[in-house]
Amino acid sequence: MTIRRTLPGLAVGALVMSLSLALSAGPATTAIAEARVPAAPTVSEQQVMPHLRALQRIADRNGGNRAHGTKGYAQSVAYVKSALDRAGFRTRLVPFIHDGATGNNLIADWPGGDPDHVLLTGAHLDSVKEGPGINDNGSGSAAVLATALQVAESGLKPERHLRFAWWGAEEQGLIGSQSYVSKLSGADRRRIDVYLNFDQAGSRNTRQWLVVHDDEHGETEAQQAFEAWFAERSIPTFDIGVGGSDHESFGNAVIPSSGFSTGISDCIHEACDNLANVDPKTETTSTDAIVGVLWKLAATAPRH
């Protein structure tokens, strides 16, 4: 993942965003938009970390990993799917084949919202064979799952359609997400307003959140929303390009994307990427950011 600084500082970034928003919408429009946004719930550590503990247990009983083509990955998919099914999501498995093994992407749709304007939020669920992948990327998967469950618990009625995804075989080269995107029709691609990707959301020693900047589409509303969310809490951010994770699959298909990462933790792609490799506070903050921004984007009337 190539990191580059696109703004000299948070203060300037916040000022630029404020000026941009002021120019793009009049006072009345802004007031209406703000009035429509329901208050986002706050997520606790107890609503996120149990999912990571579950993924650790799955790895422990399956040779220490949750890699593509293994029982560990299949059980990880089953765990997430079961939680979503109980919450009222419409779930489906989308199979693909890589290196002679069948894998599944898990797709979950929340009923309602404009099907011509989809907010797609995702993370890869697989690990490398060398370790359990609890930060890379159990942390992103758990944050997305906790967000989806908050949608259900709150009974959110979004303006846009909400879809969540957990990708397989990312560690082999973005295979699952590439397979999914390649099978979308042109019309289905255009229905996705933005794809939000989260890879490594709980890294230890995190000092700043790395927010995805989409060079193809410029500063998306999602990027603006994430940077504003963090700025309001005096949390530093750093712009990164689209690449190195599943948002690249969408970028290659000219689908707008954003999201964030907390960078590489103390251990990556080894057996030490276990539960101890995740900082619960960072993981919870990441999940709160996803919830807060998703609530904002979901309540925004689609631009026709």
Where are these regions (language model features)?
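Secretory targeting and sorting signals
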Residues: M1-A33
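N-terminal capping segment at the start of a domain
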Residues: E34-K71, D126, L196, Q200-S203, ...
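Second-shell loop/turn segments in exported
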Residues: R36-V43, R61-G72, R90, P95-I97, ...
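Extracytoplasmic/secreted proteins, especially bacterial periplasmic and envelope-associated proteins
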Residues: P38, Q47-P50, A54, K71-T91, ...
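A non-catalytic alpha/beta surface segment that caps or lines the substrate-entry region
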Residues: R53, R57-P111
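Alpha-helical metal-binding/catalytic segments enriched in His/Glu/Asp
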Residues: T121, L125-L174, I290
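Metal-dependent peptidase/peptidase-like ectodomains
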Residues: W167-S265
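His/Asp/Glu-rich mid-to-C-terminal helical/loop segments that flank catalytic regions of hydrolases
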Residues: D266-H304
